[in-house]
Amino acid sequence: MKPSVDYISGESLYRPEVVRWRRRIEERYIPPEDAAVAVLLPCSATKPYSASPSHRRFIAAIKRGAKGKRSLVHEAIMTSPLALVPRELENLYPACCYDTTVTGHWSEEEKEVLAKAIRSYAAKFKGELLCYAGEAYAEVCESLGIDVIAKDNLLSEDSLKALEERIREALMDKQGTGYNPLEPLRKVADVQFGLGAGKALICEGARVRRGRIFYKGEQVAAISERHGYLALTLRGGELLRDFSGYVVELSFFPKSNNIFTPGIEHAGEDIRPGDEVIVVYGDEVVGVGKALLNGSELAKAERGLGVVLRHRRKAA
C-alpha cells in the first residue's frame, strides 16, 4: 500500500520532502535528450496522474498528434506544492500519493515556485515548450512566454483537437526515434542517487521483468511498489558505489543486518532517513539497505541503530 500525505496549507511548500523534491528535480533531472516538444499539463486528484480520466484523454490526444513519433513528446505535470513532476517520475513519493486542496486560486508564492521550476526545466530542454492548462498554470506559463494551447474546457473535443493538431505541427519535420524503456528508470536512478547514476546502474542491455532490473542475468535493483524508488542488490551497490553520495563506510565487516552508529566511519551528506544506501568496508560493498538517520547523524552518533541492511555479503 502506498503512503499518503496531505498538502493543504501554504506551509506545505516548505515541508522537507517537498523542498527535497523540487531541489532534486532542479539539480538531478535532465529532460529526455531526444524530445522535440514538451507539454506542461495540470495535475489531477487521481494519482498517479496517468490513471486519471483527464490525463488519459490528454495522453490519447498527444498520441494521436504524435503518431509514430510519440517518443519525441515529453510531458510534465504542474502542481503545488511540488511544482513540476515529469511524467516518468509520477510514481515516486511524494508525487505518487499526495492530496491537496483544489481552489483554483494560487498565492503569489506558489506561482513563483512553479515559475522557478519551469525556468529550470526550460533551461535544460532543447525543444519547444507548450502549455495545456488553465487558471494559475496558464498565467505562469504566459508570463514565461510559453505558448498556451487551451485554457478552458480542457476536456472538450475542440480543446483536445487543438492539442492534437499542435503536437502534429510541432513534430512535422522531426524524425521519430524508438522508445527505450530503460530511460525512465535511469531518470529515477538519477533523481534518487544523483546525476550519472542511471547510466551506471542501468546499463545498455539491461532487462526489466516484473519490477526487477537485470543486467547480464544478475539482478541489480527492484522497483518499490510502495514509493516507486529503486531498491538495490549487492551487485547494484557495486555498480553505483562511485557514482553516488549515498555510501556508508564501516570500520568492521558486518555480521548482522543491523548496523549501529559506533561502527560507522563516514556517511554521505545527502543521506536522509529512509534513503537507500550502499554500505562498504574497505574496498568492498558489504551491504545495501535503508538509512534510519541522516548522513551527519550516521557519522557522528555514538549510539543507536543507523542502517538496516536488506542484502548483506557473507564472510568468506
Model-derived features: where do they sit?
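Short acidic, S/G/P-rich loop/turn micro-motifs used as interaction or catalytic elements
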Residues: 45-50, 82-86, 101-109, 135-139
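Beta-strand/loop-dominated core regions that host nucleotide or nucleotide-derived cofactor-binding catalytic loops
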Residues: 220-316
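Active-site and ligand/interface coordination hotspots across diverse enzymes
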Residues: 1-59
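Extended, charge-rich low-complexity interaction segments
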Residues: 95-128, 172-203
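Anionic-ligand-binding alpha/beta catalytic cores of soluble enzymes and soluble regulatory domains
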Residues: 164-244
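Glycine/proline-rich loop-helix segments at beta-alpha junctions forming the active-site rim
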Residues: 111-180
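Well-ordered, non-membrane alpha-helical segments in soluble/globular domains
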Residues: 19-22, 51-65, 103-120, 160-163
